[in-house]
Amino acid sequence: MKTFPVSIVTPDGPVYEKEVEMVSVKAESGEMGILPGHIPTVAPLKISAVRLKNGGHTDYVAVSGGFIEVRPDKVTVLSSSAEEANHIDIHRANEAKRRAEQRMQDKQAHVDFKRAEMALQRAVNRLNVSDMK
């Protein structure tokens, strides 16, 4: 099967750069599957896992939202943070989840509930992706 290059990039630099046969992402408008030769598209992403298939192997990368740019010959994902499944520190992700849950339960006026909720979603996503190794 044909392959195409995929780059997942954060402000700190590239996180994933490989040739793949298919990319699956969760866009704000729904699930997208991208194969070689896909029409050009730009879409905002949800906090989710990016699935990258090549042969019988699938890589998973946790992204904290961002955008996907699809060209017929290349796909680029831009995200504020991204981690490959095998690089996720499970202890750190569990701690982040615990802190976010605590902030949400405190219900104090100075707590930004939406930020705590987003932090919880990011931590849960990282834990889910780490289980996909």
From Swiss-Prot:
Keywords in alphabetical order: ATP synthesis, Cell membrane, CF(1), Hydrogen ion transport, Ion transport, Membrane, Transport
Metal-binding among keywords: no
Leader sequence segment: none
Source superkingdom: Bacteria
A GO molecular-function annotation: ATP binding
Subcellular location field: Cell membrane
Gene Ontology annotations for the cellular component aspect, listed alphabetically: plasma membrane; proton-transporting ATP synthase complex
Topology relative to the membrane: Peripheral membrane protein
Family: Belongs to the ATPase epsilon chain family.
PANTHER family: ATP SYNTHASE DELTA/EPSILON CHAIN (PTHR13822), ATP SYNTHASE EPSILON CHAIN, CHLOROPLASTIC (PTHR13822:SF10)
Biological role: Produces ATP from ADP in the presence of a proton gradient across the membrane.
Subunit structure of this chain's protein: F-type ATPases have 2 components, CF(1) - the catalytic core - and CF(0) - the membrane proton channel. CF(1) has five subunits: alpha(3), beta(3), gamma(1), delta(1), epsilon(1). CF(0) has three main subunits: a, b and c.
Protein name in UniProt: ATP synthase epsilon chain
Lineage: Bacteria, Bacillati, Bacillota, Bacilli, Bacillales
Gene: atpC
